[in-house]
Each structure stands twice: as structure tokens, then as C-alpha cells.
Swiss-Prot record:
Alphabetized UniProt keyword annotations: 4Fe-4S, Cytoplasm, Iron, Iron-sulfur, Metal-binding, S-adenosyl-L-methionine, Transferase, tRNA processing
Cofactor note: Binds 2 [4Fe-4S] clusters. One cluster is coordinated with 3 cysteines and an exchangeable S-adenosyl-L-methionine.
UniProt-recorded name of the protein: tRNA-2-methylthio-N(6)-dimethylallyladenosine synthase
Lineage: Bacteria, Pseudomonadati, Pseudomonadota, Gammaproteobacteria, Lysobacterales
Ranges of residues in domain Radical SAM core: 188-430
Record gene name: miaB
Superkingdom: Bacteria
Length: 497
């Protein structure tokens, strides 16, 4: 493998950062419903149980958490892991892969029996399949009570009420831009690491992707609203912030035109991701900042400068490239060439030489030749990608790529995928092995799932580390000496000087 080693170092130094912005005081009226969602307030007795099943990306996980927040707060529902005892059952769907709709209807069919035993169980379908299918879901599965899109989950209490009063299905798959964030309860931390959605949708319209059609075009949350949510989380012990968006580095958050902006005509009307990261870094208790998922077109010099100046910005970047062939990238409508992608990585490594870079790859895109695939493999060799995601192309109805002819046999696609994954996994394993003997900064997240007598956390380059330690370390950043590299994790011991 050529290029940089990608092994993170401990105690790295960065150039002095410029003066930053004053932080807002927590103000739940900026972005959230008033105090009923505040974790400091007692909840009323449970009025039923709620089950949520989530498919798909981290944004869906975030949305499901917000559904739970809304319904446990406003409807006094209690979460359950058992759909058979639930009064409300929701499935948050993903449409990124082929046959997603069939999987949803199959799951709904299994739940149908829960409505036939005399219980008034409400079944709802949310997420991207709901946005795509709309009324078709109710026509095909008339026992479904609610159909709602990613942008209307905050309306669930009203939809449930209307369903019970009118005794007919409720459908709302509209795109009310950023409205949902104005009606969500104050965020509740579930541990030392928290996700914060800063923008929704995507306006890039890659030829293979359904996101612009299911989540709408790019809409950014106001700058101060994001900081207010983070301020609430920081008061609850959150130490790591994960910024979310379908195209997160396209963030353009409107800034409050306060006195500083009035006296400075050159002040920007919005904050980009780099400026937002600088503002988050001013929270003393926030020790690590991450963001996902990015688009290479939006990977700006401002973001490179943030990596240069902000030590809290994790030494890891996930930047989906999809292919190393310019011909395929053009057919995908990605808007960049392989050389332009490498140029962005070169700029980043000039300020963070040891940064870990992961990516996404689509194999078997219509028309992909052996030469195209070899160019992808060459890019992998040139960059030295760490842990990455790779998939065989999945034709999505309604996207431009779904009309392209595809003559490549499935067997060849599978062979290419296996070849690519073998190389990516080898690179990742090599990086893990070379971390043995190093000292890594780890955010302790809680007990290990496999051994509750041990603790677990993540390194900056997203590797889980399991190690013996005192539970009082949970929620803290500690130094861990890495002693062993396993297939999907590391082992270590607490480092003492």
C-alpha cells in the first residue's frame, strides 16, 4: 500500500486557531418544544407502550430516537422491545437498497395479526419508503394506520389523535423544510456520545440515489439552533458530538443578524460546516467532534482549515468516492474526477498527515468494465482507505441510472466486490495491527457488550477498544495502551505514566 500510514498518533499538536464566536446560552425555545421534554421534569404515568423498528442509516437512527422522544413526552408512552405488547408500532424504513419495499410489507404482514385480537394497536410506517410509496402502502396494507415521511415525524401525536378520532388512516409525507426541529422536545442524552442532525436532504441528484426524492433537497438548520441543542446535550454529560446530514458538509446554517453582523458588512450570512465546528469546539466539555456523511464536491478549504486548527475534530474522515473511474463517476453524476478527489485528500493530509480515511464504493454500476473496476482498485491503492463500505449497485426505480443498460453478469459483480473487500479489509487489518503498542485517546462509552466486566470505547479512527477498567471512567476521555488487534476491534489497558 502506498501513501500515508493512517496510524493515529497520540498527543498531536495543531496550529493556533483564530478567535471564535460567542456561544449562545441554552434556549429550548430556539429549536425545541418547551419544557415538557426537558429531562429534569417528571413524566406522567405511562399510557401505553411504543415499539420502533429502524432500518438504514444513522440519520434514521437519529429520527427514530426523536420519534421516541416525541411520543414518550407528549403521549406518555413507554418504550418496549417487544412488538406484541406495544400499543403503537412504528417502522422507520430505508429505501437505499433494492427490494426495500418488499421487506417492509413482509414485516407489516407479520404485525397484522397483532391487530386481530381485539386490541387497538396502531401501526405506522415512516422513513424513506413511506415518502416513496405514500398512499400505496395503505392500499396494499389497509391495516396500516399512519404513513409519515422523515420531515413530518414531529406530527405523530396529531396523526395518532386523528386516527383514533376519525378511525381512518392518516398520511403525511410532505416536506415542510426544517419545521420538525422547531417542534421536537429538548434532547435527552443517552450516553457520552450524541448525534445532532444539522441539515436534511440532498441537492446533488446522483443518478443512482433516491435521497433527493425521499428526503427532499438540502435544508440547513439555523446555526444558533444547532448550538442550542449541543448546549443542552453538554449539560447532560455528552463529550462527543456527531453531526449528521445526508450531505453534511453542504451545511449552510443561517446566522442570527446580531449587532456583530450589523457592524461588520463582511460577516457571512450563514455558517458553513467549518465555522460550525469551530463554534462547537468552544464548548469546554465537548472533547471530540465528528461528522457524516460527506460529499467530495463540498469538501472545502474551510473544512481543511478546521482540521488544521481544531484538535477536537476527530482524526478520521468518511468521504464516499463510489468509483475510481472518471467515466463511471460521470455516469453517476458525482461532479468530480478521481484526480480531483485525490487532490482534496492531498490537501487534507498536508495538515493531518496521519488521518484515517474511509469511503463508500458502488460495484457493478451499469456499464462498469474491467478497466473501470481496475481504476477503482488503483484509487484504493493510491489513497490507502481504512474501513469502508462497498455494495453491488442496486437499481432504484425513478432514478436516472435505473434506465441505463446493464450487461454485466451478477457473478462478475460479486467477484469484483469480493476482490475489493478483500483489499480494503487487508488495509484496515494492517492499520489495526500497527496500532499495537501505541497509546490512543478513547471515549469510554460504557460496559463491553461481550464482557460486562470490561469497558468499551472508540478511538479517533472509529475502532472499538475493550479493556478492563473502573466503571467510573464511563463518559471520560482516557489514554489506552493498545495490546491486541482483532478482526473488528482492539484490546488494551488503561495507560498510566
Amino acid at each position: 500500500m502506498t501513501g500515508t500510514s493512517n496510524i493515529p498518533t497520540h498527543g498531536k499538536e495543531h496550529k493556533d486557531a483564530p478567535a471564535l464566536l460567542p456561544l449562545p446560552a441554552p434556549n429550548p425555545h430556539h429549536t425545541h418544544a418547551a419544557h415538557p421534554g426537558d429531562p429534569s421534569h417528571d413524566r406522567p404515568p405511562s399510557r401505553g407502550k411504543l415499539f420502533i423498528k429502524t432500518h438504514g442509516c444513522q440519520m434514521n437512527e437519529y429520527d427514530s430516537a426523536k420519534m421516541a422522544d416525541v411520543l414518550t413526552t407528549t403521549e406518555a408512552l413507554e418504550l418496549t422491545d417487544n412488538p406484541e405488547e406495544a400499543d403503537i408500532i412504528l417502522i422507520n424504513t430505508c429505501s437505499i437498497r433494492e427490494k426495500a419495499q418488499e421487506k417492509v410489507f413482509s414485516q407489516l404482514g407479520r404485525w397484522r395479526a397483532l391487530k386481530t385480537n381485539g386490541r387497538d394497536v396502531i401501526i405506522g410506517v415512516g422513513g424513506c419508503v413511506a415518502s416513496q410509496e405514500g398512499e400505496t402502502i395503505v392500499k396494499r396494507a389497509p391495516y396500516v394506520d399512519l404513513v409519515f415521511g422523515p420531515q413530518t415525524l414531529h406530527r405523530l401525536p396529531d396523526m395518532i389523535r386523528a386516527r383514533r378520532e376519525q378511525n381512518r388512516p392518516q398520511i403525511d409525507i410532505s416536506f415542510p423544510e426544517i419545521e420538525k426541529f422547531d417542534h421536537l422536545p429538548t434532547p435527552r442524552a443517552e450516553g457520552p456520545s450524541a448525534f445532532v442532525s444539522i441539515m436534511e436532504g440532498c441537492s446533488k441528484y446522483c443518478s443512482f440515489c433516491v435521497v433527493p426524492y425521499t428526503r427532499g433537497e438540502e435544508v440547513s438548520r439555523p446555526f444558533e439552533d444547532v448550538l442550542t441543542e449541543i448546549a443542552h446535550l453538554a449539560t447532560q454529560g455528552v463529550r462527543e458530538i456527531n453531526l449528521l446530514g445526508q450531505n453534511v458538509n453542504a451545511y449552510r446554517g443561517a446566522m442570527d443578524p446580531g449587532p456583530s453582523n450589523n457592524t461588520n458588512p463582511a460577516a457571512p450570512p450563514y455558517a458553513d460546516l467549518g465555522l460550525l465546528i469551530r463554534a462547537i469546539a468552544q464548548f469546554e466539555s465537548i472533547g471530540r467532534i465528528r461528522f457524516t456523511t460527506s460529499h467530495p464536491l463540498e469538501f472545502s478549504d474551510s473544512l481543511v482549515e478546521a482540521y488544521r486548527d481544531i484538535p477536537q475534530l476527530a482524526n478520521h474522515l468518511h468521504l464516499p468516492v463510489q468509483s475510481g473511474s472518471d467515466r463511471i463517476l460521470s455516469a453517476m453524476k458525482r461532479g468530480y474526477t478521481a484526480l480531483e478527489f485525490k487532490s482534496k485528500i492531498r490537501k487534507l493530509r498536508a495538515v493531518r498527515p496521519d488521518i484515517s480515511i474511509s469511503s463508500d464504493f458502488i460495484i457493478g454500476f451499469p456499464g462498469e468494465s474491467d478497466t473501470d473496476f481496475q481504476k477503482t482498485m488503483q484509487l484504493i491503492e493510491d489513497i490507502g482507505f481504512d474501513q469502508s463500505f462497498s455494495f453491488i449497485y442496486s437499481r432504484r426505480p425513478g432514478t436516472p441510472a435505473s434506465n441505463l443498460e446493464d450487461h454485466t453478469p451478477d457473478e462478475i459483480k460479486r467477484t469484483r466486490l469480493e476482490h475489493l473487500q478483500k483489499h480494503i479489509n487487508a488495509y484496515a487489518a494492517d492499520i489495526s495491527k500497527r496500532m499495537i503498542g501505541t497509546v490512543q485517546t478513547v471515549l469510554v462509552e460504557g460496559p463491553s457488550k461481550k464482557n460486562p466486566n470490561e469497558l468499551t470505547g472508540k478511538t479517533e479512527n472509529m475502532r472499538p477498544v475493550n479493556f478492563p477498567g473502573n466503571p467510573r471512567l464511563i463518559g471520560q476521555f482516557i489514554d489506552v495502551h493498545i495490546t491486541e488487534a482483532l478482526t473488528n476491534s482492539l484490546r488494551g489497558r488503561v495507560h498510566t505514566n
